């Protein structure tokens, strides 16, 4: 088990839901143009639903039996059985593979340390290590190199004498790597590539890899960094024109005379347009880069390639062990399959945790945190699909009072979920007690109280037919997505030891640091982009897309573009290191950012969590099940 921590939570959110002011009033308001406020009744709209009603009898000790017509989302049962998960096996275990990996690691380390500090090759090597998913092995070495480069170029003002000063590719690559590692490199470095009119030089379009690097670097922009905004617009236009040329056979022939990497370039550009590097999870990027790009590169290094493939497979074997441990827990708690109206998505829940923290040493975090994803999914479906308002109020009250004796006051179908939730959180609290001699049950519980109260408020919107504004929706939605529960648990895992300063800092931040709120908001908006149509068909409350359409009389396409804009703007907030992050561990901050990245990955092409489509199956297979082929 790794580091733990503590913090106190905000007051109850039932009567005073987390208002914009507890986050950053301007963060939400500046993006919304809601209509003049009108009463809930006048905003009521009829709800269309393709959900099928279920007629059933619910036994509740506090009331007579009654027949209730319920909704059903008709979720498919899980395709990954317990027996299949337990049968997963890989050869990449044992000391022989570990010895081989360590030998390759030493060779790569020597390669990294003997390079000239100002060489472009050193920057490219660091970038390659990151894209292959193996840079975590050389964290200290990379940090030392980048710190020296930053001090030499920006503290000692030697940037102009740097041999790569007028090289767009080298400048953009260095900028991205330094910003990624927390160095506030000034955006003005790109003024060297502008003409007398203050526009990026058109001749830069001839350096297509430099333009692609500029595009990737622009996603490290913070608010009001206009040069980086201009860089993104310029690079996007250049890259699109390049792609158009490739589609023209005559133009393509001309390009081939000067560049043999056109196919590779096209793959990289399309990949960047789907999601920029900064927004991607490490594990998925590593598998893609290994499978599709690196082996075909003219400068491919066989030692790096062998090391990356072996490391991927060894870590994957650890993930399989973690998954099997989780699967046994799920079987033993006997909740899976009991609630036929809810999503049973154990494998998908574990995929989230691979996105949050993939390194082999963090098994405890993955094994416990994935339980929360499973429980959030089940309880979300209780509130969204099945429960009556009266039952949901009972469940919310039971979570708030946190007394297992209250189980007899709940309907039968709620008893098992509440009991499993109660036991799971208490067990996690026990782990913290053993590790740090601190009782944190109240803090873990409070995150669930906040979540359930948000769920309840959304249920009230549904039953009253209320149409929230986008502002109202996001005030609630950043919490109701459930990511805050995950990140609170992560905070306890990655802050060790817990100090009084940690507690004081969190209290001053209204108990949810900005980086948590930012990550949760991106998760909510990404979820809405991927699932809102399906959820509306199931009869759920309007999501951010529909709220924006209602507020602004906009089309769905216009609303989707605005939600993407909100995601981009929220990333700018996350790119800026707040003062409140000073008390947060580096691992925890990275998990928060990885939450946003994983959400964008999961919902990139639809509902990758609830829907068991071919794409989600393929992703699970490549990341968790199928090792990379390594010829003997």
From Swiss-Prot:
Enzyme Commission number, as recorded: 4.2.3.15
- Record note on domains: The Asp-Asp-Xaa-Xaa-Asp/Glu (DDXXD/E) motif is important for the catalytic activity, presumably through binding to Mg(2+).
- Protein name listed in UniProt: Myrcene synthase TPS3FN, chloroplastic
The annotated pathway is: Secondary metabolite biosynthesis; terpenoid biosynthesis
Annotated organism of origin: Cannabis sativa (Hemp)
Annotated organelle transit peptide span: 1-55
Does the record bear Metal-binding in its keywords? yes
Which positions does the motif DDXXD motif occupy?
380-384
Q: Which gene encodes it?
A: TPS3FN
Catalytic reaction list:
(2E)-geranyl diphosphate = beta-myrcene + diphosphate
Family, according to the entry, reads as follows:
Belongs to the terpene synthase family. Tpsb subfamily.
Among its keywords, does the record have Endoplasmic reticulum? no
What's a GO cellular component annotated to this UniProt protein? chloroplast
């Amino acid at each position: 088990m790794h580091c733990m921590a503590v913090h106190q939570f905000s007051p109850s959110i039932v009567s005073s839901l987390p208002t914009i002011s507890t986050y950053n009033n301007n963060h939400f308001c500046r993006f919304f143009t809601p209509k003049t406020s009108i009463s809930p009744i006048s905003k009521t709209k009829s709800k269309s639903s393709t959900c099928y009603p279920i007629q059933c009898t619910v036994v509740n000790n506090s009331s007579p039996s009654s027949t209730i017509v319920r909704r059903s989302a008709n979720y498919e049962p899980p395709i990954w059985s317990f027996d299949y998960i337990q049968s997963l096996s890989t050869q990449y275990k044992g000391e022989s593979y570990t010895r081989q990996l360590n030998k390759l690691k030493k060779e790569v380390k020597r390669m990294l340390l003997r390079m000239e500090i100002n060489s472009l090759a050193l920057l490219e090597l660091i970038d390659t290590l990151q894209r292959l998913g193996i840079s975590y092995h050389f964290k200290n070495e990379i940090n030392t190199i980048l710190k020296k480069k930053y001090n030499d170029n920006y503290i000692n003002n030697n940037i102009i004498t740097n041999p790569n000063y007028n090289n767009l590719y080298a400048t953009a690559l260095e900028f991205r790597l330094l910003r990624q590692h927390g160095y506030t490199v000034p955006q003005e470095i790109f003024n060297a590539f502008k003409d007398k009119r203050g526009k990026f030089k058109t001749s830069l379009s001839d350096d297509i890899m430099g333009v692609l690097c500029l595009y990737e670097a622009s996603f490290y922009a913070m608010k009001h960094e206009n040069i980086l905004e201009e860089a993104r617009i310029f690079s996007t236009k250049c890259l699109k024109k390049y792609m158009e040329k490739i589609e023209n056979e005559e133009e393509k022939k001309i390009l081939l005379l000067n560049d043999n990497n056109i196919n590779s370039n096209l793959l990289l550009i399309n990949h960047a347009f789907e999601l920029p590097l900064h927004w991607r999870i490490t594990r998925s990027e590593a598998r893609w880069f290994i499978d599709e790009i690196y082996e075909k590169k003219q400068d491919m290094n066989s030692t790096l390639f062998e090391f990356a493939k072996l490391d991927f497979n060894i870590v994957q074997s650890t993930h399989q062990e973690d998954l099997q441990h989780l699967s046994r827990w799920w079987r033993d708690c006997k909740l899976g399959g009991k609630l036929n109206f809810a999503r049973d998505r154990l494998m998908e829940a574990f995929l989230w945790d691979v996105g949050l923290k993939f390194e082999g040493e963090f098994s405890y975090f993955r094994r416990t945190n994935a339980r929360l994803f499973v429980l959030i999914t089940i309880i979300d479906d209780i509130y969204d699909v099945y429960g009556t308002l009266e039952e949901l109020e009972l469940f919310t009250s039971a979570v708030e009072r946190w007394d297992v004796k209250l189980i007899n006051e709940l309907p039968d179908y709620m008893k098992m979920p509440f009991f499993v939730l109660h036991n799971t959180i208490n067990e996690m609290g026990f782990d913290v007690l053993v590790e740090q001699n601190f009782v944190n049950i109240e803090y873990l519980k409070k995150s669930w109280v906040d979540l359930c109260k948000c769920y309840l408020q959304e249920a009230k919107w549904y039953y009253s037919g209320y149409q929230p504004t986008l502002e109202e929706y996001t005030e609630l939605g950043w919490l109701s997505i459930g990511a805050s529960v995950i990140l609170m648990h992560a905070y306890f895992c990655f802050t060790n030891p817990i100090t009084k300063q940690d507690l004081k800092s969190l209290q001053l931040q209204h108990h949810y640091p900005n980086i948590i709120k930012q990550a949760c908001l991106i998760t909510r908006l990404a979820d809405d982009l991927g699932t809102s149509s399906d959820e509306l068909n199931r009869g759920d409350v309007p999501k951010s897309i529909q709220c924006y359409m209602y507020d602004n009389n906009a089309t769905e396409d216009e609303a989707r573009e605005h939600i993407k804009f909100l995601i981009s703007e929220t990333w700018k907030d996350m790119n800026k290191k707040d003062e409140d992050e000073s008390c947060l561990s580096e691992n925890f901050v990275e998990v928060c950012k990885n939450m946003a990245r994983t959400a964008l990955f999961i919902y990139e092409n639809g509902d990758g969590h609830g829907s068991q489509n071919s794409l989600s199956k393929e992703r699970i297979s490549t990341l968790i099940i199928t090792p990379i082929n390594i010829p003997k």
